[in-house]
Amino acid sequence: GFRERRALLPDFRRRAEALYGLPDGEGLAVSLVRNQPWSGYNWYDGGRRSRVDLNTDLPIRAADLLFVLPHETYPGHHLEHAWHEAHLVDGLGRMEASVLGINTPECLLSEGLADLGVAGAQRGARAADRVHDLKGILAR
């Protein structure tokens, strides 16, 4: 189930670190939730920390999980927000950059960046190999 699938996070984190680097002190926690309209959601808590919720009510196929987890975590929303805070807020003192608007043009850009990050992180790893890796994790 979902608990075993979270075993993919260290791999996603390593790939993102190799491609984009990781800001100091970043981290996240993954929670399983119910009764939500989405399959996954990133709640950025600040301090380079995120809480990622995965909805267990919706069926998520193995292939879907190879998109949802990195989209919300590494190199997706979590890493984007952590770097945003590290550079703009902490580095340049732009406190206004600590406000994350919902249903704004910035939100649209964030979705696109998360999708592009996933595509970049998965380049070089054939989808068949990734699904094979996932099947091994799920079989445990």
Located regions from the model:
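Contiguous, non-catalytic segments that form substrate-binding/exosite surfaces or channel walls
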Residues: 1-52, 59
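Short alpha-helix carrying the canonical HExxH Zn2+-binding catalytic motif
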Residues: 62-79
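Primarily interfacial, aromatic-capped hydrophobic alpha-helices that serve as membrane anchors
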Residues: 11, 34, 114, 120-121
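Post-HEXXH active-site segment of zinc metalloproteases
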Residues: 63, 79-106
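Long, amphipathic alpha-helical stalk/connector segments used for oligomerization, subunit docking
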Residues: 111, 118-140
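Short, solvent-exposed loop/turn segments at the edges of secondary structure
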Residues: 45-49, 63, 109-112
